[in-house]
Amino acid sequence: MAASELYTKFARVWIPDPEEVWKSAELLKDYKPGDKVLLLHLEEGKDLEYRLDPKTSELPHLRNPDILVGENDLTALSYLHEPAVLHNLRVRFIDSKLIYTYCGIVLVAINPYEQLPIYGEDIINAYSGQNMGDMDPHIFAVAEEAYKQMARDERNQSIIVSGESGAGKTVSAKYAMRYFATVSGSASEANVEEKVLASNPIMESIGNAKTTRNDNSSRFGKYIEIGFDKRYRIIGANMRTYLLEKSRVVFQAEEERNYHIFYQLCASAKLPEFKMLRLGNADSFHYTKQGGSPMIEGVDDAKEMAHTRQACTLLGISESYQMGIFRILAGILHLGNVGFASRDSDSCTIPPKHEPLIIFCDLMGVDYEEMCHWLCHRKLATATETYIKPISKLQATNARDALAKHIYAKLFNWIVGHVNQALHSAVKQHSFIGVLDIYGFETFEINSFEQFCINYANEKLQQQFNMHVFKLEQEEYMKEQIPWTLIDFYDNQPCINLIESKLGILDLLDEECKMPKGTDDTWAQKLYNTHLNKCALFEKPRMSNKAFIIKHFADKVEYQCEGFLEKNKDTVFEEQIKVLKSSKFKMLPELFQDDEKAISPTSATSSGRTPLTRVPVKPTKGRPGQTAKEHKKTVGLQFRNSLHLLMETLNATTPHYVRCIKPNDFKFPFTFDEKRAVQQLRACGVLETIRISAAGFPSRWTYQEFFSRYRVLMKQKDVLGDRKQTCQNVLEKLILDKDKYQFGKTKIFFRAGQVAYLEKLRADKLRAACIRIQKTIRGWLLRKRYLCMQRAAITVQRYVRGYQARCYAKFLRRTKAATTIQKYWRMYVVRRKYKIRRAATIVLQSYLRGYLARNRYRKILREHKAVIIQKRVRGWLARTHYKRTMKAIIYLQCCFRRMMAKRELKKLKIEARSVERYKKLHIGMENKIMQLQRKVDEQNKDYKCLMEKLTNLEGVYNSETEKLRNDVERLQLSEEEAKVATGRVLSLQEEIAKLRKDLEQTRSEKKSIEERADKYKQETEQLVSNLKEENTLLKQEKETLNHLMVEQAKEMTETMERKLVEETKQLELDLNDERLRYQNLLNEFSRLEERYDDLKEEMTLMLNVPKPGHKRTDSTHSSNESEYTFSSEFAETEDIAPRTEEPTEKKVPLDMSLFLKLQKRVTELGQEKQLMQDELDRKEEQVLRSKAKGGERPQIRGAELGYESLKRQELESENKKLKNELNELRKALSEKSAPEVNAPGAPAYRVLMEQLTAVSEELDVRKEEVLILRSQLVSQKEAIQPKDDKNTMTDSTILLEDVQKMKDKGEIAQAYIGLKETNRLLESQLQSQKRSHENEAEALRGEIQSLKEENNRQQQLLAQNLQLPPEARIEASLQHEITRLTNENLDLMEQLEKQDKTVRKLKKQLKVFAKKIGELEVGQMENISPGQIIDEPIRPVNIPRKGKDFQGMLEYKREDEQKLVKNLILELKPRGVAVNLISGLPAYILFMCVRHADYLDDDQKVRSLLTSTINSIKKVLKKRGDDFETVSFWLSNTCRFLHCLKQYSGEEGFMKHNTSRQNEHCLTNFDLAEYRQVLSDLAIQIYQQLVRVLENILQPMIVSGMLEHETIQGVSGVKPTGLRKRTSSIADEGTYTLDSILRQLNSFHSVMCQHGMDPELIKQVVKQMFYIVGAITLNNLLLRKDMCSWSKGMQIRYNVSQLEEWLRDKNLMNSGAKETLEPLIQAAQLLQVKKKTDDDAEAICSMCNALTTAQIVKVLNLYTPVNEFEERVSVSFIRTIQVRLRDRKDSPQLLMDAKHIFPVTFPFNPSSLALETIQIPASLGLGFIARV
């Protein structure tokens, strides 16, 4: 069909827009050929008349159907053009948050400016091994494709990463290298992948800088070759760099920085090791402050410096070299601060003692004067003379900057060289993958030499890219055998010729650089003369003579000629370099070793420093003028040569392209600027790829997919059995132009737009069918609805009319009744009102009259009381006046009497003074005295009588007074009562009158009260009835409340049970976590063991050491010994000496055990020697003290002390000797790691045996010496007794004589022997008593401690109980008592069990001993039997016994152990054993052998057998670890062996299910609990290996069977994609289906059942298998946009139901396997539910509790409708989901950990099989073992 036919009404198109680049619009009417205007409707609601170009009449680009928007591959779009590409990228980037998109063979990566969780190890594992087209676009997919193609095609690969600065090139390259490092691993002993990754921080610090476009912009290009060996493991890497931006060292634009390393140095200046560099803030250096932006937000330069140093250390750059690098970098910074002062216009100088220059010279180790001179001067050389010429300040500054740039460039190259040296490998490189991180096409306002080189490189890369794309397109057409014509594509060879051909731009530039007076202007004129108007790609700007324009493949670029020559020459003065070469700093001359001799036009040197000096030059011995003619290569030439080498490398590899796009210039996250994106798409070749694809057949369908999609366009008669012929017939009818499509072998190829046309036909057909279906259904529904409404209306009318008639009759009855009721009611109301008013009036009257009477009474009473008060007051006033008057009279009398008394006193005093008065008075005084005396006596008597009378009278008076007072009070009370009675009488009279009146009123009110009572009675009855009803309701409510309480109690019980279950689950989770950590450690340990073995093998191969056959390596020995060797509790240390005499054919583990025991014995000897030494020291102190007291015994004491010191020295020398011998032994054992070292006869073995013999002999000698020394100490104690000074010499002499006599007679030896025996006996008794006392003391201490703890607990409990209420206190005390009794009961039970075990063990030993005694008795009887001939040998004959009672043991000889292990483990075929014999037979045989060794009490035999068994199982699994049947077999047997060790261990917990006969088979001598733990660890390792095996088998099936295969045919509609799949990296091994997975699961299950694996263990394996299936399926679903659809959700749900059915068939529903599929089930449900409203969001949040928030959002973002009738998930709905899930606490991880292994447990499963019934089949080849 014609293209114009697609421009119909409602068709959507793209029109150009100055702001948005392209804008979408919709046609309002059909387009007809010849129309000049299109009526469009824009998306913002405006109408537009779009005028077509009259010259070309080109129609606007058509927009793709919405179903195609958001495709993974841009070439899958039906319409391939710029607006479609731009829109698709924008939708994926903004709406779906997807930064990667394919464009044919190109991966387009848009920088999100945000950290995304899509680069973790789980994502790497998900992409590993997958086809590139099967997964969503990702840098890991490109890396995986390169890695697989390298392995499949045996061809080197390249990944070319390009883009603008800030587009993310470096990050993409870094992630690609991380992918290779993760999936491949390294082949050498060092982690090469870590070194490759460690090179990134180093290169970023010295080669990256902050620019206005990027905070971490790479200012150089690099190509990293990652080398692989034949096994495709990383062995090394090599890096090439291109065009370092040296000018940044000395100059930075605004808001930019120098290289990161300078700022890292300044940030770390305060470190102690950096003090010598004398650095400071970055703002204090000229080379780091020009940009004005020394800090980067979010970046800590000090931490980055630490990372850089760590990376240097990892790459082998020593600390001294690192400090040398930092020293040179610091010198560059100080060099930038060197300033110049102008002396005149042609010369300059440096200030004296200039500090920056001094620091620079100190750091560089050069002479200050020389450097100062050559910074201000230069040499000019002629043929015979050399001139030293001063330079101006500007020239000196430029020379300083050139020197700084040159030093930095040399340092950069030196570091790159050392990095390459560190990454180099001695192993031969088999292949490599190169990662090219190169600058993209650049165009700025001012473009210079750097942009010219960058764009030149991009021209070369674009040419290579176009050729590769074109080649792939043509190869696809040829493969499908379709006719094709040559695709026209842009060839940029003319532009490359313009740059690099002879007389090209670079050639003219180099030629101009050779000219003595060449300038940028002359070079520009040569360009104009050579290329202007001769080359269509070269232009001259109109307004400039110093610029030129080149038409590159991406855009026109105008270059400014200024600076081209200088940058191309890269000139630096040789004299300055020579000064640096003469440095004392050794590292600095290394940087300039490769410099060419002619750095500047002059090469001679001179020491003169005059402003202009002519110096005669003697000709050198070499060729005259040689150095003057030599020139170094220009920068352009070097760059061109390196670029040619790069292109040769890339052309020899298979390229993979990554184009990085910068979405905006402001680094805003997920913000898309269409203008900038279009510029970069044009520049990076993406649109060229689209154009090449669109020129051919971009859309490709297989015949089956085309038939499935467009079956609706076919009639029944068109459908044939041959799908290919059917598709051809239909296409010929649908598309008349046969050039629009081609039929290939397996695919149909369509031109651009044809798929959209087919989609339009399909949509029209489906729309017409939908309209017809809707029309029919709507008519049927309306007709059905009308009939239903008619029947309903008639029925409603009938019921309504009847209802109206009944209502009218009821109305009449109610009206009549209402009239009668109203009559009686009105009468009743009026009568009631009258009665109420009358009663109220009477009540008011009564109350009013009573009120008036009471007022009158209160008035009279007040008047009466006022009179009484007046009376009392007047009497009181009169009495008061009388008392005051009497008081005044008495006072006057007193005053008068006092005056008279004073007068009389005065008179008496005067009389008393006269003598005559005394005389008169004395006359007759005596008689008077006598008389007066008598009178006094009489008066005293009278006085006494009167006093008695007075006392009596007072008593009488008091009693009378009291009576009178009482009478007065009684009278007063009577008076008051009388008054009250009088008032009461009056009031009673008034009340009587009042009561009479009230009585009358009461009688009148009685009637009304009776009436009210009747009414109240009625109301009460009504109230009672109401109360009864309320009571009934309350009873019902009570019952309801009781029921509610029961339910609440039940609910509380359920809640408590639920909480208990939750806590139990939490504890189980904690236990599983702990198990998982432990098993992960075991897994890591086994992995490290394997790695160690691999490394050791490689080391052996590298060192060419012949590997002896069947000998254990040292590593195996050490690991086995450390893991499995332990000392039995029944082994005794006295067995050491006999074991040393065993044959030398002992195994190495036994030798090592002897060595350990020997070392232990030496330690014991050392301790014993130390005790003896301490005792000797104490005795020596006692001797010294006694010597100080007794000075007359020096000779004897000196001799004794000398003897003791001599013995001590001998002991010390012997101890040193033992230590030396032990060290020699250790050295001999550790000198070599070869296996023969520990073999019998080896030097280490001989040394071991000799030392063992010597130590056993020394042991006896030392014991005797100990006894001798102790006896001497005893004799010394007896000798040192306080004696008299006189007898000292005599006693000592006698003592010496006695000793001499005893020596002569030989009695001393006998005394010594007796004393020694006595001391031994006493010593043993003392030691036993000491031990018993210590044990008793320890027991008492433990009891005291337990009592203290119990006391503390009781005190704490008492303190807690005192704070509780009484009920709780009682309950707490009871609880404590119960707990205490329970604990005591448990302790007693434990003691009882221990005693029972001891009794059983003793009984068994008794039986064994009794049997041995019986056998010995029988042997003795046979030996003494008559007729026996001793000399004649008799051949032994085996006589079988009839009905022998076997004990369930197998006897074997020690030398047959290796044969047993070989036949039973190493060479055993699991299939034959599992099919023909009982399950677990090897485990039973091994245990029966262990039982016999236990029966013999042979510790060594048990240890050797168990160690050999474990090592042999490991060896078998290492050899055949990929065979599921082998791993399953040995997992089953290992578990059975472990269960046997438990079942027959003799422990009570494992003997519950045993028979009495089985209990007799328990082990008697050894406790193998430690070996049970070792076997458990081994079983865990085997289980983990089993999981890895089944994962490797299942993994290729899962994605195909669970996702890709259509189990329900016809449900999934094929999307109209372009089907531009990448070439599969994995060979097509056939399509797996769900049935394949189920068959494999059946195979696994049957094998495990045949091997007799425990049912619980089978459940755990099945659970792990289902987890792997669910995790891998979900991970692929989350990474594949094409799988996220409604129909795919139905397929997944059906597949999961089939897996559940399999679980039901195998009775494994309770294994927990179904729960592991819950995330997958919820993801399938999420694909099927509605996703529009808030209610849908709420339902999704509650439904998807097993999915994380990231997974839910990812699925919603990836959801893609299969056809256009479905709607996409809106962005607002996804945001609603995110808001609702914001508070959910789950992992931010996107993918499930497919490598996760659930912790495994081995529940005890005893066997009912009796050991004595087991027969050994002859097929096992175990004839050398015998049943016992």
UniProtKB/Swiss-Prot annotation:
InterPro entries for this protein: Dilute_dom, IQ_motif_EF-hand-BS, Kinesin_motor_dom_sf, Myo5a_CBD, Myosin_head_motor_dom-like, Myosin_N, MYSc_Myo5, P-loop_NTPase
Phosphothreonine: modified positions: 1032, 1733
Q: Which UniProt keywords apply?
A: Acetylation, Actin-binding, ATP-binding, Calmodulin-binding, Coiled coil, Motor protein, Myosin, Nucleotide-binding, Phosphoprotein, Protein transport, Repeat, Transport
- N-acetylalanine modified-residue sites: 2
Q: Where along the chain is composition biased (Basic and acidic residues)?
A: 1136-1147
**Molecular-function GO terms, alphabetical:** actin binding; actin filament binding; ATP binding; ATP hydrolysis activity; ATP-dependent protein binding; calcium ion binding; calcium-dependent protein binding; calmodulin binding
Q: Which residues bind ATP?
A: 163-170
Instruction: Please explain the role this protein plays, according to its UniProt record.
Output: Processive actin-based motor that can move in large steps approximating the 36-nm pseudo-repeat of the actin filament. Can hydrolyze ATP in the presence of actin, which is essential for its function as a motor protein. Involved in melanosome transport. Also mediates the transport of vesicles to the plasma membrane. May also be required for some polarization process involved in dendrite formation.
Q: Which Pfam families match?
A: DIL, IQ, Myosin_head
Q: What is this protein called?
A: Unconventional myosin-Va
User: Which residue range or ranges hold the IQ domain?
Assistant: 766-788, 789-813, 814-836, 837-861, 862-884, 885-914
Where would I find the Dilute domain in this sequence? 1507-1783
The modified positions for Phosphoserine read: 600, 1425, 1625
What Gene3D superfamilies does this protein's entry cite? 1.10.10.820, 1.20.5.190, 1.20.58.530, 3.30.70.1590, Kinesin motor domain, Myosin VI head, motor domain, U50 subdomain
Domain annotation Myosin N-terminal SH3-like: ranges = 8-60
Give every Myosin motor domain span: 69-763
Q: Which family does it belong to?
A: Belongs to the TRAFAC class myosin-kinesin ATPase superfamily. Myosin family.
Region labeled Actin-binding — which residues?
A: 643-665
Q: Which SUPFAM superfamilies match?
A: P-loop containing nucleoside triphosphate hydrolases
Q: Which GO terms describe its biological process?
A: actin filament organization; actin filament-based movement; axo-dendritic protein transport; cellular response to insulin stimulus; chemical synaptic transmission; developmental pigmentation; dopamine metabolic process; endoplasmic reticulum localization
**Bias (Polar residues) ranges:** 600-610, 1116-1130
Q: Which domain of life is it from?
A: Eukaryota
